[in-house]
Amino acid sequence: MGFRFLDIVKPFTSLVPEVGQPDRKIPFREKVLWTAICLFIFLVCSQIPLYGIRSTDSSDPFYWAKVIMASNRGTLMELGISPIVTSGMVMQLLAGAKLIEIDQSVKADRDLFSAAQKLFGMLICVGQGVAYIWSGSYGDPAVLGFGNCFLIVLQLFFAGIIVMLLDELLQKGYGIGSGISLFIATNICETIVWKTFSPTTVSVGKGTEFEGAVIALFHLLLTRNDKVRALKEAFYRQNLPNITNLLATVLIFMVVIYFQGFRVDLPVKSTRVSGQQGTYPIKLFYTSNIPIILQSALVSNLYFISQLLYRRFPDNILVNLFGAWRTSEYSQQMIPVSGLTYYISSPNNMSAVLADPFHALFYITFMLTSCALFSKVWIEVSGSSARDVAKQLKDQQMTMKGHRDTSVIKELNRYIPTAAAFGGLCIGALTVVADFMGAIGSGTGILLAVTIIYQYFETFVKEQQELSGGIGGLF
């Protein structure tokens, strides 16, 4: 039996900023404009440096999740979408486990639950800000002083609120999609383009090379006498983006888009209008990119906690079992070398897989299991289970052809849980393959980018269908 946690939140709802529901139907062009404005605000905040910091040269605790969490080191977007994703994940899982009692059919409960998510997200902003300072990410806290430390946390707090409001603005229908998806896709695509065409030079043992894979290819071919060796280096150079990584990225993009088309169309008909028929599609990626977002949020927080503990207690046995870390000579970032965090981190390439096959096997098992479980749990807590879909069809005066209302749930249960679990499994498998192939932007990043871009494509198509009306617009 759950407790009325939402009643505890009620007195604080007046402190939570909220975007009101639109009082009219927003035209599609206006939605595009608001989406562009939200993206512009996010990109500007990603370039404004935090006031009061002394240094950002130290290892970044969230280095592993920077691209996925749409964050930018040393700026207002230091935390990115991490607070809102973490708060949403925790609250949804608590509601799904019935530890928080909520009736989704009651508007007051839905509003309180949304306010509770925001409050928790605001607390996470403060907590992560304090943890960043305590870890010395911006310099020695004693040197920074209380005033600067307070200002840094305050800036991160208000930046977190801005992200929440931008996300809510889009989700309430003023724009297209969600802020979280928009910011993730933008950050990942920016990273892929930069690592492909970056003109930045990097000093390596053989001299100076360009960071961008394509730029480096032409540079090596033009400056090296041995063209075959130059081509080989451009394809297989270590610790910098290479052409093989780029080709792997393109391949994964194409495979994910191909799998997006896999679906089962269930025939439905209207119980009100005779002869009106349509289909209800159940996709292979039924929960879309949610499993990988939740898995990334879980892992990034585990990394964060592990690094903080290891910096303070490097000789503690339990801390070392959780994760031991060292500084990479190439990126100057902390990387896990043993413990739980090491085994749930991805091997960088096939050489690393062959060097430690147990690590690779553990990582594969962890990714596949966690993505499948998160996908299964998500359909229950997000209102997309067989029972919820059957209720939606009934509310729209629709039913499945050849089935009575009482047997619709049973028929949907044949497809939805399987699609959720198997779809999550496929998402995890594609992520693992992309990681092992060394795809640019990480396997997780590419999966997120492709699924988000595909969602936007579907949204554009749906908008066109709604203009023409009919049953096709419902599904």
UniProtKB/Swiss-Prot annotation:
Appears to play a crucial role in the insertion of secretory and membrane polypeptides into the ER. It is required for assembly of membrane and secretory proteins. Found to be tightly associated with membrane-bound ribosomes, either directly or through adaptor proteins. It comes from the Eukaryota. The chain crosses the membrane at residues 33-53, 76-96, 119-139, 146-166, 174-194, 242-262, 290-310, 354-374, 412-434, 441-461. Residues 1-32, 97-118, 167-173, 263-289, 375-411, 462-475 are cytoplasmic. The keyword Phosphoprotein does not apply. The keyword Signal does not apply. Residues 54-75, 140-145, 195-241, 311-353, 435-440 are lumenal. The lineage of its organism: Eukaryota, Amoebozoa, Evosea, Eumycetozoa, Dictyostelia. One of its GO terms (cellular component) is endoplasmic reticulum. GO terms for molecular function: protein transmembrane transporter activity; protein-transporting ATPase activity; ribosome binding; signal sequence binding. GO terms for biological process: post-translational protein targeting to membrane, translocation; SRP-dependent cotranslational protein targeting to membrane, translocation. SUPFAM superfamilies: Preprotein translocase SecY subunit (SSF103491). It holds the Pfam family Plug_translocon. Belongs to the SecY/SEC61-alpha family. This is Protein transport protein Sec61 subunit alpha. It is found in: Endoplasmic reticulum membrane. It is a multi-pass membrane protein. Its main location: endoplasmic reticulum. Keywords: Endoplasmic reticulum, Membrane, Protein transport, Translocation, Transmembrane, Transmembrane helix, Transport. InterPro entries: SecY/SEC61-alpha (IPR002208), SecY_CS (IPR030659), SecY_dom_sf (IPR023201), Translocon_Sec61/SecY_plug_dom (IPR019561). Heterotrimeric complex composed of SEC61-alpha, SEC61-beta and SEC61-gamma. It comes from Dictyostelium discoideum (Social amoeba).
